[in-house]
């Protein structure tokens, strides 16, 4: 596997997380835990950092309902949010302190990037303070240079995906712009245009996606991807049945099949188009058991070159991974705690049970507690 994009993260004072100190991240990070343990909040940290990088800190706070909703137990309990991430064995780092205002917003109290040449300066990295601007973090400045620009570029290469909406108004089922194909959007609203682009320019990846969908849905032959005749700037997701020449579009697919198509596209797209960090909250939702095992294989394959962070409630999906891939979330004293599993303490158990079975037997933690 390649070196993970991120190697450590520290989170303090964010939503249900009072303190997670220097958590090591691997190429694969599978979060398990009961409802309310804070798995989604941990993944939400990355969305928060992305918003900060994009210059949308104030917009994020407003949409969340104010700073009190983001701070751990509110501003009476927590006086700041502190986030710190490191890249490439801590050579480059980024940290930000956010404090509440009287107007129930957040302001940047301190922000810095770090560079650590451990051979020349073994004791500590040197820091470069960043100045905030117009209420937004300095890392959002597109004119930044040096280490700041390096970190800003890395923060822009993450993407958080939610493919939960497969209703009649799902973005995946709507007509998309043909030209909207630079990357797969977080809700797969441009799934048709992105697949069309892959078919035209990245045939090998398109073929892998098609074959993966055929394994989950044997009735599926191929996608029909052409700009609409009435408006050549638009395209919709259509497909061909192996035993019928009737018209089929995304609405003709089951919810699980449509989600799997989006997931297969995400994990099998060419490396040059893929985000450096892929984050997905409960990707197994609505999938058939066989599709869940396929999903595990897709994640492991993608993680050879891309860092993956997923949360799951599926014991079957958990079975596809090694103990060291797993982060267990528990709520201890009203705060989210994360710990990584290790193979050695589980060695005798794993001779008789799978990882998912051990989780169901409450041998791993991450289960509801009375």
Give the location of each predicted region:
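Conserved catalytic network of the ASCE P-loop NTPase/AAA+ motor domain
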Residues: 75-76, 89, 268-273, 300-304, ...
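Pre-Walker A-like glycine/lysine-rich segment at the N-terminus of P-loop NTPase domains
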Residues: 1-80
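GG-anchored amphipathic helix commonly corresponding to the ABC/SMC/Rad50 NBD signature/C-loop
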Residues: 234-236, 241-245, 249-280, 290-293
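The Walker A (P-loop) glycine that initiates the GxxxxGKT/S ATP-binding motif of P-loop NTPases
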Residues: 33, 282, 313
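C-terminal lobe/lid and adjacent interdomain/linker elements of RecA-like ASCE P-loop ATPase modules
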Residues: 1-4, 293-370
